[in-house]
């Protein structure tokens, strides 16, 4: 088996996790108490969904997941929520006092007390796997726990499970919507370790997802539940090929192989289509070509950056539902002829496609319509650098005055870590610039000849 262990850190990680596990359960027909009436092989078996769920002798399906937070309120919601019987109590780890939006508390003072317990639980889960494939890590980098404890856990996972791939689903601060003043500090410090300790990192930001909810689902005031349900569709599409059998399956390691040209250039944009409300879906049926086009629309991107400002290095299209390879090839061929979608010249093919015949599931009473086919795109584009340069700029404004720095130093950090992390990000911006600029040397007028 190729099992994956999910690790949900901090409030954002846990709430996205709730949405994901709810959706997985619906897709596999697993009840909130973990029973699965449709499962023929009780107590084990080699079903595809066993990559994400382990089975007990009594036929209960338990998620291979750990939820960690430094304060109890968010995890208590899981403990008392609809899916409380699904999780093993040991999988829900909460501390007593939170990180107070402070990276240093999450990484040094409070975080280090809880990190061994987490690793112990993760070790138990991994002992339960026959062929652990890797980790999916969910966190946000604006707060204290997601950024501080998140990077601490990633660092320790690298030590304990060096060769296993780590996929990060990371919520980055939005340009306009901010939840804390020190977001830029936490993000920069955290990205410093994401750079080294994740293999692929998928960037999400709330503002972009708010806009998608407003525009495509006509929700005037989207809540976090609305956002998380949309994010969970993306994550479900990515992991569908691990959980179901399909025509063109995609392994976790394949993301890395196909999307990451250089180790540091591993921050991805994601988009999902069709995002469509039930009222609209009733009247229209979307073709493969249409959903593929809308996945490339700048407005579909789940992070606030415009792919037209950069070049694509590679992208991965995961289709699910009623889709055949012939349609996919035609849709991709059309995309390649578009002048607005530019690829770097050293990566002429640039497309990795996966097809899964299981149609996308939806949460009953949710906002998304049940559709016959959907596509999720993960793309590596040089425009991601916009996300970093925005955060770096805000970081510089605050750090020039050393504002709020004493809170970090007081928790045992050194000021040098700030400048070290900031330099690392400056180097990252430069890396992206070089990767995108490699073709301006010899070609001035004939950029279109790579097709």
Swiss-Prot record:
SMART domains xrefs: Tubulin, Tubulin_C
Binding annotation for GTP: 11, 71, 144-145, 179, 206, 228
Q: Which residues form the active site?
A: 254
Cite the Gene3D superfamilies for this sequence.
Helix hairpin bin (1.10.287.600), Tubulin/FtsZ, C-terminal domain (3.30.1330.20), Tubulin/FtsZ, GTPase domain (3.40.50.1440)
Q: Which cofactor does it need?
A: Mg(2+)
Q: Where in the cell is it found?
A: Cytoplasm, Cytoskeleton
PTM comment for this protein?
Undergoes a tyrosination/detyrosination cycle, the cyclic removal and re-addition of a C-terminal tyrosine residue by the enzymes tubulin tyrosine carboxypeptidase (TTCP) and tubulin tyrosine ligase (TTL), respectively. Acetylation of alpha chains at Lys-40 stabilizes microtubules and affects affinity and processivity of microtubule motors. This modification has a role in multiple cellular functions, ranging from cell motility, cell cycle progression or cell differentiation to intracellular trafficking and signaling.
Site residues, Involved in polymerization: 451
Q: Give binding positions for Mg(2+).
A: 71
List residues modified as N6-acetyllysine: 40
Keywords, ordered alphabetically: Acetylation, Cytoplasm, Cytoskeleton, GTP-binding, Hydrolase, Magnesium, Metal-binding, Microtubule, Nucleotide-binding
- GO CC annotation terms, alphabetical: cytoplasm; microtubule
Q: Which GO terms describe its molecular function?
A: GTP binding; hydrolase activity; metal ion binding; structural constituent of cytoskeleton
Coiled coil segments of this chain: none
- Catalytic activity, as annotated: GTP + H2O = GDP + phosphate + H(+)
Q: What is its EC number?
A: 3.6.5.-
Which SUPFAM superfamilies does this entry report, sorted A to Z? Tubulin C-terminal domain-like, Tubulin nucleotide-binding domain-like
What Pfam families does the database record attribute to this sequence? Tubulin, Tubulin_C
Task: Give the range the annotation lists for the signal sequence.
Answer: none
GO biological process terms on file: microtubule cytoskeleton organization; mitotic cell cycle
Subunit composition and interactions: Dimer of alpha and beta chains. A typical microtubule is a hollow water-filled tube with an outer diameter of 25 nm and an inner diameter of 15 nM. Alpha-beta heterodimers associate head-to-tail to form protofilaments running lengthwise along the microtubule wall with the beta-tubulin subunit facing the microtubule plus end conferring a structural polarity. Microtubules usually have 13 protofilaments but different protofilament numbers can be found in some organisms and specialized cells.
Family, as annotated? Belongs to the tubulin family.
What this chain does, per the entry, is described as:
Tubulin is the major constituent of microtubules, a cylinder consisting of laterally associated linear protofilaments composed of alpha- and beta-tubulin heterodimers. Microtubules grow by the addition of GTP-tubulin dimers to the microtubule end, where a stabilizing cap forms. Below the cap, tubulin dimers are in GDP-bound state, owing to GTPase activity of alpha-tubulin.
Annotated protein name in UniProt: Tubulin alpha chain
Identify the gene encoding this protein: TUBA
């Amino acid at each position: 088996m190729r099992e994956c262990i999910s690790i949900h850190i901090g409030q954002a990680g846990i709430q996205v996790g709730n949405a994901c596990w709810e959706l997985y359960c619906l897709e596999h027909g697993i009840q909130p108490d973990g029973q699965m009436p449709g499962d023929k092989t009780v107590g084990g078996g080699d079903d595809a969904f066993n990559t994400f769920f382990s089975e007990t002798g009594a036929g209960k399906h338990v998620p291979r997941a750990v939820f960690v937070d430094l304060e109890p309120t968010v995890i208590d919601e899981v403990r008392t929520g609809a899916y409380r019987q699904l999780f093993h109590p040991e999988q829900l780890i909460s501390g007593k006092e939170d990180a107070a939006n402070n990276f240093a508390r999450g990484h040094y003072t409070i975080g280090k007390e809880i990190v061994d317990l987490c690793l112990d639980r993760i070790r138990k889960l991994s002992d339960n796997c026959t062929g652990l494939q890797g980790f999916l890590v969910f966190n946000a980098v604006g707060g204290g726990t997601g950024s501080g404890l998140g990077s601490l856990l990633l660092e320790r996972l690298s030590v304990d499970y060096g060769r296993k791939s780590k996929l990060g689903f990371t919520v980055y601060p939005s340009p306009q919507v901010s939840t804390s003043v020190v977001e830029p500090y936490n993000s920069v410090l955290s990205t410093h370790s994401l750079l080294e300790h994740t293999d692929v990192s998928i960037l999400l930001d709330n503002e972009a997802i708010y806009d998608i909810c407003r525009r495509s689902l006509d929700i005037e005031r989207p809540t976090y539940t609305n956002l998380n349900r949309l994010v969970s569709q993306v994550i479900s599409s990515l992991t569908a090929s691990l959980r179901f059998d399909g025509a063109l399956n995609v392994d976790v390691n394949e993301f890395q192989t196909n999307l990451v040209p250089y180790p540091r250039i591993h921050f991805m944009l994601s988009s999902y289509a069709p995002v469509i409300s039930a009222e609209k879906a009733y009247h229209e049926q979307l073709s493969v070509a249409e959903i593929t086009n809308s996945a490339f629309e700048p407005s579909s991107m789940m992070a606030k950056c415009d792919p037209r400002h950069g070049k694509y290095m590679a992208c991965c299209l995961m289709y699910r539902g009623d889709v055949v390879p012939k349609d996919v090839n035609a849709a991709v061929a059309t995309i390649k002829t578009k002048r607005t979608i530019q690829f770097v010249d050293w990566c002429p093919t640039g497309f990795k496609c996966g097809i899964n015949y299981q149609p996308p599931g939806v949460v009953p009473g949710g906002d998304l319509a049940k559709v016959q086919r959907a596509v999720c795109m993960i793309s590596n584009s040089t425009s991601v650098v916009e996300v970093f340069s925005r955060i770096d700029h805000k970081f510089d404004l605050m750090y020039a005055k050393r504002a709020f720095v004493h809170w970090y130093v007081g928790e045992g950090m050194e000021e040098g870590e700030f400048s070290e992390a900031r330099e690392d990000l400056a180097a990252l911006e430069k890396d992206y610039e070089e990767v995108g600029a490699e073709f301006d040397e010899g070609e001035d007028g004939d950029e279109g000849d790579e097709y």
